[in-house]
């Protein structure tokens, strides 16, 4: 993938979403393919978006007692084998180091697919008393899972960036509260920062994290009707505490096993963001994540060049002073039309156009990236005005995504209805489910759709009395969908 190609998107999001997505990632300067299959190079603009996701979450984590740490990339095989469910769950995806230079290692080292097995032993070492709990650790790192056969930047890569949080608690209540706190923070990220409506739920028992008691999930719907598992938060019970001897002495000096959690969000969130908001003109970004929130474009003739550029520069400086991320595009070798197209391609949420008329009248013309809405406003108070317009851009993006989601949740009462509805429309189909994994198989085999979540509330009544597949009594509501 090379960035030195024709400016502008040539593929259609509606008709060729896969090709369109790859072209947006390429031409908006987000990523390049690495020489090894399944790996990508994240370019500065793409990494800047990830940094803003990271900064928001990192602040919220720290506000709620989390400390950052870093653990080794390599995990001894014996450590990985201590939790048998983790071994069984990840074994096909683990990359192994067998040699150091020309010498064969005494013990194979796994390139971390996830870090429970290397973090838990140290949590055990650092936990002695109930006063040491809760212990809340997080690390920002990359992991490797040798599963991607077709590279799709930010969606399917063998190596990906993420954060993984790991906590230990004295009891189930504390650990479950932690699990839900992190799930709520992920939902907040999608709503307040990414302008995307999240669905919160649980994974069905057969699809929970290996070794977990309960896996909770954030699901987001893509325009092509597929869902993305956008973040997960796991209550691990005492399985890891028992496997790695994470114990503590309570107030009565009785030894107890700690309850643990883990939770994570990867750069798949970036893939979901790009897929949800972007269009046939290129990348569309919510203001909170845009590297440049505003671009100021002066439009001049030779006889008014200095006056127009000075006016635009003063306006840009005022926005910068107000902590708006702003770029002044006063390049002389590019015409205004080229600049407009380029900044639309790069996803800048708001464009400010300054020509001789704006200078003469003490105004500025604002153009919204998502829909091209244009408004001429007073120059006075421009920082407050621009901030209001950025809020409006976020609201537009959220409303559009919410409207799409609401129209893509349907119900079904039979296997045929599930197959027909997803086959025709995509999206989510809710139905009664008996809780048996076998009832998922005919849907998965026929159209590659599966149960992506069930309601968080275990006491919630199922949407229908009978299981849509086998006809037995329904235990809960299942959401079927195709997924990335």
Curated annotation (Swiss-Prot):
SMART domains: ProRS-C_1 (SM00946)
Record's subcellular location: Cytoplasm
Gene Ontology CC annotations of this record: aminoacyl-tRNA synthetase multienzyme complex; cytoplasm
Main subcellular localisation: cytoplasm
Transmembrane spans: none
Single Gene Ontology BP annotation: prolyl-tRNA aminoacylation
Keyword Protein biosynthesis recorded: yes
Domain of life from the UniProt record: Archaea
Database matches in SUPFAM superfamilies: C-terminal domain of ProRS, Class II aaRS ABD-related, Class II aaRS and biotin synthetases
MF terms in GO: ATP binding; proline-tRNA ligase activity
Catalytic activity as recorded in UniProt: tRNA(Pro) + L-proline + ATP = L-prolyl-tRNA(Pro) + AMP + diphosphate
Top-level enzyme category: ligase
Annotated EC: 6.1.1.15
Record's keyword terms, sorted: Aminoacyl-tRNA synthetase, ATP-binding, Cytoplasm, Ligase, Nucleotide-binding, Protein biosynthesis
InterPro entries on file: aa-tRNA-synt_IIb, aa-tRNA-synth_II, aa-tRNA-synth_II/BPL/LPL, Anticodon-bd, Anticodon-bd_dom_sf, Pro-tRNA-ligase_IIa, Pro-tRNA-ligase_IIa_arc-type, Pro-tRNA_ligase_II_C
Complex and partners: Homodimer.
Family: Belongs to the class-II aminoacyl-tRNA synthetase family. ProS type 3 subfamily.
Free-text function comment from the UniProt entry: Catalyzes the attachment of proline to tRNA(Pro) in a two-step reaction: proline is first activated by ATP to form Pro-AMP and then transferred to the acceptor end of tRNA(Pro).
Notes concerning its domains: Consists of three domains: the N-terminal catalytic domain, the anticodon-binding domain and the C-terminal extension.
Name the record gives this protein: Proline--tRNA ligase
């Amino acid at each position: 993938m090379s960035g030195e190609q024709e400016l502008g998107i040539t593929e259609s999001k509606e008709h060729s979403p896969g090709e369109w997505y790859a072209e947006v990632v390429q031409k908006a300067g987000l990523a390049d393919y690495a020489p090894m299959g399944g790996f990508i190079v994240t370019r500065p603009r793409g990494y800047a978006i990830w940094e803003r996701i990271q900064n928001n979450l990192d602040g919220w984590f720290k506000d709620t007692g989390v400390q950052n740490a870093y653990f080794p990339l390599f995990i001894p095989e014996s450590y990985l084998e201590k939790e048998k469910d983790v071994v069984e769950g990840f074994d096909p995806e683990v990359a192994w180091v067998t040699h150091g230079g020309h010498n064969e290692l005494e013990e194979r080292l796994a390139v971390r697919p996830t870090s429970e097995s290397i973090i838990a032993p140290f949590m055990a070492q650092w936990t002695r008393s109930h006063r040491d709990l809760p212990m809340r650790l997080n690390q920002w790192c990359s992991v490797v899972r040798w599963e991607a056969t077709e590279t799709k930047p930010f969606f399917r890569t063998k190596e990906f960036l993420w954060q993984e949080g790991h906590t230990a608690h004295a009891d189930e209540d504390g650990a479950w509260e932690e699990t839900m706190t992190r799930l709520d923070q992920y939902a907040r990220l999608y709503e307040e920062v990414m302008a995307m409506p999240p669905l919160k739920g649980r994974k069905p028992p057969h699809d929970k994290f290996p070794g977990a008691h309960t896996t909770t999930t954030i699901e987001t719907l893509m325009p092509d009707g597929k869902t993305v598992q956008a973040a997960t938060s796991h209550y691990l019970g005492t399985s890891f505490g028992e496997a790695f001897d994470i114990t503590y002495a309570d107030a009565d000096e009785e030894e107890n096993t700690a309850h643990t959690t883990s939770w994570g969000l990867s750069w798949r969130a970036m893939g979901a963001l790009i897929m949800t908001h972007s269009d046939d003109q290129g990348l569309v970004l919510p203001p909170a994540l845009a590297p440049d929130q505003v671009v100021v474009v002066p439009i001049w003739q030779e006889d008014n060049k200095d006056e127009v550029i000075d006016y635009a520069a003063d306006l840009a400086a005022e926005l910068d002073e107000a902590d708006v991320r702003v770029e002044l595009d006063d390049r002389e070798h590019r015409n205004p039309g080229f600049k407009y197209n380029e900044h639309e391609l790069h996803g800048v949420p708001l464009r400010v156009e300054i020509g001789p008329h704006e200078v003469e009248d003490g105004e500025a013309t604002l153009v919204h990236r998502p829909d091209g809405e244009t408004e001429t406003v007073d120059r006075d108070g421009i920082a407050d005005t621009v901030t209001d317009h950025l809020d409006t851009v976020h609201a537009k993006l959220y409303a559009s995504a919410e409207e799409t989601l609401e129209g893509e949740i349907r119900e079904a009462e039979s296997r045929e209805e599930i197959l027909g509805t997803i086959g025709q429309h995509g999206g989510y189909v809710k139905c009664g489910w008996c809780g048996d994994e076998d009832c998922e198989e005919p849907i998965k085999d026929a159209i590659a759709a599966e149960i992506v979540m069930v309601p968080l509330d275990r006491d919630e009544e199922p949407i229908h009395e009978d299981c849509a597949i086998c006809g037995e009594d329904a235990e809960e509501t299942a959401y079927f969908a195709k997924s990335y």
